[in-house]
Amino acid sequence: RFLCLSTDLELADHLPNLAYVNYVSDPKEWLVLLRVPSLWRVLVPTDGSLSDDELRSDKIKNGIFDRLVGDGASVKTEHRTLYRVHQRVAKSFREGRVMLVGDAAHLNNPLGGFGMNSGVHDAFNLFEKLEPVLKGKAQMEPSLALYDRQRREVTHSFTQMQTKENMAFIKGGQDGAHEARRAKMLEIKNNDETRRNYLMRQAMFDSLAQ
């Protein structure tokens, strides 16, 4: 599970060069810092031995912000939320005339932002199948079966795989695998064609053609 702490404290005043989405990789404590319109959200993995009340306590909150900015007791939070992370894919994205898209069809950890984006791609793909059916230009059965096959395949081959890889990477910290991936990313950065292909895949544009 993740603990999400929301605060109006301007973290950028304490941590230079923050982006709107920041993944902090550390073997002792990894976390995510997200900027939303009026708040910063701090997402941290939780200790499974602690109760919900303990995880949402001032003690936990203070410790997290002590390590982030110092003087955690003075940091006010607007929300303290616990939520469970799943890696699941429905056996079928279709049940008769009912079609599943987004979180109804698949769940994954939030590292990389693939959940919402893949849901948008589901809807886009389904629209492409439904429009000709509704206009009488295509048969419903093969069209909906194709949607199910295409989107489940992409979910398994990319979204699930990539989010699991992201989780392993951020949890690993500065180990050998981390250094190897950093070296690989530098190679990608320095090659125009490789960089474009990588960005197309990460932006999930490649999956639209599958």
PLM segments and residue spans:
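Detector for Asparagine
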Residues: 17, 22, 62, 108-109, ...
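Short, exposed beta-strand "edge-strand" segments with a Pro/Gly-rich flavor and a Y/T-containing core
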Residues: 51-55, 112-116, 126, 188-189
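Conserved FAD-binding catalytic core of PHBH/FMO-like flavoproteins
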Residues: 1-85
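C-terminal helical "tail/cap" subdomain of flavin- and related membrane-associated enzymes
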Residues: 129-210
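Charge-rich, low-complexity amphipathic helices
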Residues: 27, 55, 83-87, 99, ...
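Conserved mid-domain beta->alpha element of the FAD-binding
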Residues: 77, 83-160, 164
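Conserved flavin/dinucleotide-binding core of flavoenzymes
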Residues: 59-62, 66, 88-99, 210
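General N-terminal targeting signals
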Residues: 22-24, 40, 48-50, 57-59, ...
